[in-house]
C-alpha cells in the first residue's frame, strides 16, 4: 500500500490537473458559443442565396457551367480541415484517418497527381508524415475563420479546376450537428452537382417561404445570373465548412475537457478513500503497538 505522503501528493497533483481541465472547458465553451453565433449570423445569407439559385435552376434546368464539367479524373485535390491544437478527443485523428482512406482511393494516380490542401496544423503534420507535400499552409484560417481567406482558397480551387489543372476536388471536415454530435464528412466540391445543390437548397428554405411568389424578371438572362451565383455558392461553401469545422473543434474540446474533469473527480474520490484507509490503518497499527508495549 502506498505511503500517506505519496497518496496525498497524488491527490494534490490530480486536483491541479482538474483545475486546468475545468478552465480549458470554460474557454472552449466561450469559443463554442462565439462560433455558433457566427454560423447563425451566416445562415440567413446562405439560405437566401440557395433559395434564389434553386428558383433559377428550376427555370433553366439545362444550364451548363465550367464548374459542372465532369471529366476523367487524372489529377485530384483534397481539402482537409482540422484544428491547430490537440486536447479535443479524436477530432484530429479521425480527419487524418479519413484523409488516408481518401488518398488510398486515388493511389493509382500517383502522389504527383494528388494535391492536398491542409487547413489546420494537425492535418498538415499528418500530410507530411504520409509523404505528401502540402499545397500551402492554412493554420491561421483554422484558428480564426475568415471569409476573405476562405474566398481566396475557393478562388484558387475554382481556377485550377476551370484551367483543367485538377479534375476533381473533395472536402473532408466535421459537420456540427449539436453539442455532442459532430459528423465527419467527405464531400465532392468540384465538379458541382447542380441537382444536389438544388435539392439541398430546397431543404434549407423555410416552410413559410416556399409558397412565396418568386416569378422574377431577370436581365440579361437566367443563365448569366446563375453563372454569377455559382462562384458565390462555391466560395460560401468553403466558408461554411470552415465555420463548421471550427465549431466542431470547440465542441469536441469542451466534451473532452468535461470527460477529463469527471475522470479527475472520480480519481480524487478513489484516492481520498485510499488515503483515509491508509491513515486508519496507520492509526490502528500505532494503537496496537502502544497496547502491546503496555502489556509487556
PLM regions: where:
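C-terminal beta-strand-loop-alpha-helix "lid" module of Rossmann-like NAD(P)-dependent dehydrogenases
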Residues: 1-296
Amino acid at each position: 500500500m502506498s505511503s500517506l505522503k505519496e497518496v496525498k501528493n497524488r491527490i494534490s497533483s490530480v486536483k491541479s490537473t482538474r483545475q486546468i481541465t475545468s478552465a480549458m472547458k470554460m474557454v472552449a465553451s466561450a469559443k463554442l458559443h462565439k462560433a455558433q453565433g457566427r454560423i447563425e449570423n451566416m445562415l440567413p445569407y446562405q439560405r437566401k442565396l440557395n433559395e434564389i439559385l434553386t428558383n433559377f435552376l428550376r427555370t433553366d434546368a439545362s444550364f451548363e457551367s465550367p464548374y459542372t464539367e465532369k471529366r476523367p479524373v487524372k489529377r485530384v485535390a483534397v481539402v482537409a480541415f482540422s484544428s491547430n491544437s490537440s486536447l479535443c478527443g479524436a477530432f484530429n485523428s479521425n480527419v487524418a484517418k479519413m484523409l488516408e482512406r481518401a488518398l488510398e482511393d486515388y493511389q493509382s494516380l500517383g502522389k504527383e497527381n494528388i494535391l492536398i490542401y491542409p487547413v489546420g496544423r494537425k492535418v498538415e503534420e499528418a500530410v507530411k508524415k504520409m509523404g505528401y507535400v502540402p499545397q500551402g499552409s492554412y493554420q491561421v484560417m483554422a484558428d480564426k475563420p475568415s471569409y476573405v481567406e476562405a474566398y481566396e482558397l475557393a478562388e484558387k480551387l475554382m481556377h485550377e479546376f476551370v484551367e483543367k489543372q485538377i479534375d476533381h476536388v473533395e472536402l473532408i471536415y466535421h459537420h456540427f450537428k449539436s453539442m455532442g454530435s459532430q459528423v465527419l464528412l467527405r464531400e465532392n466540391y468540384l465538379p458541382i452537382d447542380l441537382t444536389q445543390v438544388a435539392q439541398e437548397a430546397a431543404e434549407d428554405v423555410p416552410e413559410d417561404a416556399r409558397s412565396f411568389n418568386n416569378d422574377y424578371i431577370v436581365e440579361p438572362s437566367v443563365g448569366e445570373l446563375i453563372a454569377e451565383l455559382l462562384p458565390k455558392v462555391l466560395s460560401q461553401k468553403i466558408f461554411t465548412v470552415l465555420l463548421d469545422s471550427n465549431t466542431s473543434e470547440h465542441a469536441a474540446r469542451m466534451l473532452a475537457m468535461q470527460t477529463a474533469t469527471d475522470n479527475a473527480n472520480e480519481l480524487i474520490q478513489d484516492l481520498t478513500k485510499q488515503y483515509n484507509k491508509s491513515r486508519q490503518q496507520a492509526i490502528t497499527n500505532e494503537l496496537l503497538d502502544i497496547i502491546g508495549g503496555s502489556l509487556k
